[in-house]
Amino acid sequence: MKVAVLGAAGGIGQALALLLKLQLPAGTDLALYDIAPVTPGVAVDVSHIPTAVNVKGFSGEDPTPALEGADVVLISAGVARKPGMDRSDLFNINAGIVRGLIEKVAITCPKACVGIITNPVNTTVAIAAEVLKKAGVYDKRKLFGVTTLDVLRSETFVAELKGLNVSRTSVPVIGGHSGVTILPLLSQVQYAKWNEEEIEPLTKRIQNAGTEVVNAKAGGGSATLSMAQAAARFARSLVKGLSGETVVECTYVEGDGKYARFFSQPVRLGKEGVEEILPIGPLSNFEQQALENMLPTLRADIELGEKFING
């Protein structure tokens, strides 16, 4: 099994490289790529950690050597948010970066499972899909927006608020990966009794948690460490699925189009990537209303990505 990280010299990428070196199964090959010349050094650095994961680093304009033979590709390349920016402000720069990298994926490892971390995910996943489609290699079972950080934050905040064991707290999060499109299904959390006045503030805190980190870092970065852990968890789940284990994760994929062309919901992962898209289950009145309210925003985000490729 080979996992490639594109954008491995960045804030998320370096932390992700470390976590994957520690957490991937023994015998996995880990390829680290970034345009920055420091990248082979990042690979040497993590290669000194004693685990049976083999690491190689690549830098320069062309990611092809890192992509050759890859089963899983994680894309975290791009610019990060700064105070006053929202994820959509990143679009102008990151859209072109994702397009360029996916064009290489389409040529070099078209059957790989691709996890998009680069924001704005609602839009960059649509860009990736259209590039793969133009190349004639699009398989919707193999393209994912990594929304796992919304799940991690939900688990953390719910466990804190309700005094639950965080390792046993599970919160499905549906929709997209920015602002109002992030919808934690708090009504489905086991062992949590909710007062009406708790739901809305907690939902808003989860939706705005990325901004909380950006502001707290005072211009010094965005959520890199928690995002890296979220991406590492998703990568481990993908690798388990590809190896024949049954794993369920919430992730942003192209499904039946009931709510939007791309939508984050629980997905059973397997040997072909998406094995089955699971139902979102019963919603509270608050959640149903929030879902209906977010859809125009989510659909517009997706359309922006489609138009970026198709004009």
Swiss-Prot record:
The active site is at H177. It is an enzyme of class 1 (oxidoreductase). It catalyses: (S)-malate + NAD(+) = oxaloacetate + NADH + H(+). Keywords: NAD, Oxidoreductase, Tricarboxylic acid cycle. Pfam families: Ldh_1_C (PF02866), Ldh_1_N (PF00056). GO terms for molecular function: L-malate dehydrogenase (NAD+) activity. Signal peptide: none annotated. InterPro entries: L-lactate/malate_DH, Lactate/malate_DH_C, Lactate/malate_DH_N, Lactate_DH/Glyco_Ohase_4_C, Malate_DH_AS, Malate_DH_type1, Malate_DH_type1_bac, NAD(P)-bd_dom_sf. Its EC number is 1.1.1.37. GO terms for cellular component: cytoplasm. The keyword Iron does not apply. The keyword Oxidoreductase applies. One of its GO terms (biological process) is malate metabolic process. NAD(+) binds at G7, A8, A9, G10, G11, I12, G13, D34, N94, I117, T118, N119, M227. Substrate binds at R81, R87, N119, R153. Belongs to the LDH/MDH superfamily. MDH type 1 family. Catalyzes the reversible oxidation of malate to oxaloacetate. Homodimer. This is Malate dehydrogenase. It comes from Haemophilus influenzae (strain PittGG). The gene is mdh.
